Amino acid sequence: MPPTPCSLCHTARALVKRPKTGQQVCKDCFFEVFETEVHNTIVEGEGIFKRGERVAIGASGGKDSTVLAHVLSVLNKRYDYGLDLYLLSIDEGITGYRDDSLETVKQNQAEYGLPLKILSYSELYGWTMDKIVEQVGKKNNCTFCGVFRRQALDRGAAQLGVDHIVTGHNADDIAETVLMNIMRGDIARLARCTAVTTQSEDTIKRSKPFKYAYEKEIVMYAYFKKLTYFSTECIYSPDAYRGHARVFLKDLEAVRPSAIVDIIHSGESFVLEQSVQRGMKALQTCLRCGYISSNDLCKACALLEGLESGLSRSALRQTQESTSAAPEGHRTIPMFERYASLNGTPRTPPTPAEPVEGIERAA
């Protein structure tokens, strides 16, 4: 039986069957169509980026962030986006997992020639995830990690003076999030979880260029490009709630390959009614650390106070309503500062030529 020709160039032998479309394509055409689809996501509408932006790539060393760093470096040159790219990594303090994956990030730094900033939970919160799990157990540890990681990314970006954070969240991740928000009845998050770009009044802009990129295609891209990435799953994630949504999504995909993007499009159709929006809490800044919050105390400060006090999970919720200073002797989070304040007063970020504390420059 003769080899199947590429359905795009009709000359080379097809090596890849795209999970998203069913197209059988050669390696070079796969690279081109994958990169072009990411570019189309970037430039759709008003576009994700603005020329001259300083952009931090959330780098974990995994397949998604590794491919994102590679593809953004390629597209930035090919289409002349005019971006200053950085790698920003968060060290959660998970022995045997994050310490190994950060070595992969450092290899990526050398390969792509991008400056790297690493910020740890230990230096920011005084806790590592290993210590947190010792205290709270594995059942609820993802709550702590998610809250701490999101704020750590914003704080690392502020230290770099960047305008924008991009993450490697792919189509599978976003479809899982839609399903999770439906199962939890989380209307507010359901209405915004499919957006390519999100930004609150005083948070740094975040974007997901891989919104429509299937996880399987990201893996194939990394494989055929021979990219170095860390493939071990977090040792604390098997019990995460997201895992149930992931299993359900894979079952749907097996029956209907377009299920992933279909769920994303369904999520895009959800819009909050004005009456619901008016009932939501207004955003303000945390009285302790200055980070954006819908309560007087942000989630990170509330969780940290609970850890420092040895509180149970039910008691942790009560700390979010606290307006008092942290108890004496408790560790607290440094004040959050960024380059555009809540009242609109601009603050000048460091220019690319200025050294930024804690940054590792590519050789």
Curated annotation (Swiss-Prot):
CDD domains for this protein: CTU1-like (cd01713)
Cellular component terms (Gene Ontology): cytosol; cytosolic tRNA wobble base thiouridylase complex; mitochondrion; peroxisome
Pfam families listed in its UniProt record: ATP_bind_3, zn-ribbon_14
SUPFAM superfamilies reported in the protein's UniProt record: Adenine nucleotide alpha hydrolases-like
Entry keyword set: Cytoplasm, RNA-binding, Transferase, tRNA processing, tRNA-binding
EC number from the UniProt entry: 2.7.7.-
Recorded metabolic or biological pathway in which this protein acts: tRNA modification; 5-methoxycarbonylmethyl-2-thiouridine-tRNA biosynthesis
Region (Disordered): 340-363
Localization per Swiss-Prot or TrEMBL: Cytoplasm
InterPro entries referenced in this protein's UniProt entry, alphabetically: CTU1-like_ATP-bd (IPR056369), CTU1_C (IPR032442), Ncs6/Tuc1/Ctu1 (IPR000541), Rossmann-like_a/b/a_fold (IPR014729), TilS/TtcA_N (IPR011063), tRNA_thiolation_TtcA_Ctu1 (IPR035107)
One GO MF term attached to the UniProt entry: tRNA-uridine 2-sulfurtransferase activity
A GO BP entry: tRNA wobble uridine modification
Record-stated family: Belongs to the TtcA family. CTU1/NCS6/ATPBD3 subfamily.
Known function: Plays a central role in 2-thiolation of mcm(5)S(2)U at tRNA wobble positions of tRNA(Lys), tRNA(Glu) and tRNA(Gln). Directly binds tRNAs and probably acts by catalyzing adenylation of tRNAs, an intermediate required for 2-thiolation. It is unclear whether it acts as a sulfurtransferase that transfers sulfur from thiocarboxylated URM1 onto the uridine of tRNAs at wobble position. Prior mcm(5) tRNA modification by the elongator complex is required for 2-thiolation. May also be involved in protein urmylation.
Name assigned to this protein: Cytoplasmic tRNA 2-thiolation protein 1
UniProt source species: Cryptococcus neoformans var. neoformans serotype D (strain B-3501A)
Upper classification of the organism: Eukaryota, Fungi, Dikarya, Basidiomycota, Agaricomycotina
Gene: NCS6
